[in-house]
């Protein structure tokens, strides 16, 4: 609720000052506070001091050793601390999580200042218009970076929060190692882990669209995952027998056979729970299962088995027939 209020403060700031993009945060900050760019001996992005202190003007300090786009975000964040009436005293924005005051109140104020900064630099109506006008998420990301004056990761996280279910992003460094990944709310597929390699990209080959752009030494990938996938298997036969056949061909160890079946049933149980949550078609359920199976490398022997698609199609038809 308070986060919503923080966003409204940023919206009001836009209309009150008739701001244009990229927002001149330096000019704006000077209307509310003393502003200094400084070097810090510790790992800190910025400070908002003298907040709501009688007779004192608030002061904003920004770490000048950070990249320009990051300084802009920090500045927008500190303006948030200054204008939100319940943010009081002195707030230090420490980058190193181990040194952060972990109190709930501090974390809430940080989330509010971030929500304020996000809305100030990348207004909701602007992002929504970009999403309406363009299909290519790489194009949209690059427009946000350029016209919003933000970092590619800030633009990516902004899109993540606004996209509907079914989108996943990956950031890969020059050594082809994943440094960041995430998904829009409600997406079935789980993002790969930090440190995973290019195999994670291959596992998303079922995506209906892929958008890529590079920024510095990083490559950004957006995947649009299909709402529905055509059932590929012939689904002749009983899915239980098919699963039995598959696990027996993979291993003769009965304990391992049981473990495989439990893992497969875990994914299918999830699919079953989706049926209870809302309307599903055979094809949408198949897509949900493909998304859940695709990045589970422990199940590779199963999912790469020639009878797996038959098994999955048969199981899904069985699930649907029971509705
Ligand atoms: Zn802060």
Feature annotation, model-predicted:
Residues 1-323:
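Active-site hotspot residues in diverse enzymes, especially metal/ion-binding acidic/histidine motifs
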């Amino acid at each position: 609720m308070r986060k919503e209020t923080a966003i409204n403060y940023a919206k009001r700031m836009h209309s009150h000052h008739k701001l244009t993009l990229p927002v001149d945060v330096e000019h704006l900050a000077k209307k509310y506070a003393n502003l200094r760019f400084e070097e810090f001996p510790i790992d800190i992005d910025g400070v908002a001091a003298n907040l709501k202190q009688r007779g004192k003007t608030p002061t904003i300090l920004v770490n000048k050793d950070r990249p320009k786009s990051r300084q802009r975000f920090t500045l927008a964040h500190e303006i948030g601390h200054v204008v939100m009436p319940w943010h009081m005293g002195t707030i230090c924005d420490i980058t190193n999580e181990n040194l952060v005051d972990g109190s709930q109140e501090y974390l809430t104020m940080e989330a509010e200042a971030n929500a304020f900064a996000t809305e100030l630099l990348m207004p909701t109506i602007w992002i929504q218009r970009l999403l309406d006008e363009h299909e290519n998420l790489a194009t949209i990301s690059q427009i946000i970076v350029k016209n919003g004056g933000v970092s590619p990761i800030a633009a990516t996280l902004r899109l993540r929060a606004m996209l509907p279910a079914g989108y996943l992003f990956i950031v890969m460094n020059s050594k082809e190692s994943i440094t960041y990944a995430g998904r829009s709310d409600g997406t079935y597929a789980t993002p790969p882990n930090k440190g995973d390699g290019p195999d994670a990209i291959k596992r998303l080959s079922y995506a209906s669209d892929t958008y890529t752009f590079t920024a510095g030494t990083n490559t950004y990938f957006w995947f649009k995952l299909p709402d529905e996938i055509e059932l590929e298997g012939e689904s002749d036969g009983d899915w239980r027998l098919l699963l039995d056949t598959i696990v027996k061909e993979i291993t003769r160890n009965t304990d391992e056979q049981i473990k495989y079946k439990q893992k497969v049933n875990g994914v299918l149980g999830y699919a079953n729970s989706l049926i209870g949550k809302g309307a599903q078609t055979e094809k949408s359920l198949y897509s949900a299962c493909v998304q859940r199976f695709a990045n589970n490398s422990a199940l590779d022997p199963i999912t790469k088995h020639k009878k797996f698609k038959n098994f999955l199609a048969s199981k899904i038809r069985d699930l649907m027939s029971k509705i």
